[in-house]
């Protein structure tokens, strides 16, 4: 797994008291959804952890629901902006987004969109609206788009990361499922290369089959 470095900010009330670099390992990523899951290499439990909106609550979202976006606007330290949901399913390049009018600008990308009353994570800020004006562009910071929560669940399920929302699942079970999937996929590819068909009941390795030929 690739290792990355992240910056974690600590607060005392509304004041940032420290900003610490922390390493982490990329568990999974998806270029289509522009999402990644990172496991932090830390021994200190993070005090505040957001919960993803429950899957059965997604259809209960309404235009006008209060929301907050948070991110490092124009490389500033993280700060929140309030607004409301203005469109529940905007399709851009065949991908679904929520639209909100909480001001967002370059630097907010990847920051969370949170429900204003429930505190749920709804998505990640992904796009802003721009208008071409001559040789420049005008940014409509009040027309921001965030990853639709259904896409979060598509990512979690495809990557076997159900433990992020299911209390009956756990990290170690998820890692075993991911390992099993990779093994089965590799086995199918190798068998296909040998002109053989995978048999679910057959536990022999492709190497053993090759030796039998």
Q: Predicted regions: what is each one?
A:
Residues 1-11, 121-213:
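C-terminal cap/linker of serine protease catalytic domains
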Residues 25-27, 41-76:
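Active-site substrate-binding loop(s) of clan PA
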Residues 1-31:
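Catalytic-histidine neighborhood of serine endopeptidases
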Residues 20-22, 33-36, 63-65, 81, ...:
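Envelope-exposed proteins and targeting segments
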Residues 14-21, 74-82:
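Short coil-to-beta-strand transition motifs
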Residues 41-51, 77-160:
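Active-site region of chymotrypsin-like
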């Amino acid at each position: 797994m690739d290792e990355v470095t992240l910056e974690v900010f600590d607060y005392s009330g509304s004041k940032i008291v420290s900003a610490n670099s922390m390493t982490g390992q990329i568990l999974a990523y998806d270029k289509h959804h522009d999402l990644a899951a990172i496991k932090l290499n830390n021994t200190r439990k993070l005090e505040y952890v957001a919960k993803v909106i429950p899957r059965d609550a997604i259809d209960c979202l309404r235009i006008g629901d209060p929301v907050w976006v948070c991110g490092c606007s124009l490389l500033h330290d993280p700060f929140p902006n309030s607004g409301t949901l203005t469109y529940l399913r905007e399709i851009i390049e065949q991908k679904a987004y929520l639209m909100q009018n909480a001001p967002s600008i370059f630097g907010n990308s990847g920051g969370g969109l949170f429900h204003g009353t429930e505190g749920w994570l709804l998505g990640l800020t992904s796009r802003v609206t721009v208008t071409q004006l001559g040789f420049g562009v005008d940014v409509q910071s009040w027309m921001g788009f965030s990853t639709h929560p259904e896409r979060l669940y598509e990512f979690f399920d495809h990557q076997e990361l159900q433990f992020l929302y299911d209390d009956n699942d756990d990290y170690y079970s998820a890692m075993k499922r991911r390992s099993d999937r990779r093994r089965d996929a590799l086995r199918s590819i190798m068998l296909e290369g040998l002109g053989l068909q995978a048999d679910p009941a057959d536990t022999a390795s492709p190497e053993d089959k090759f030796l039998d030929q």
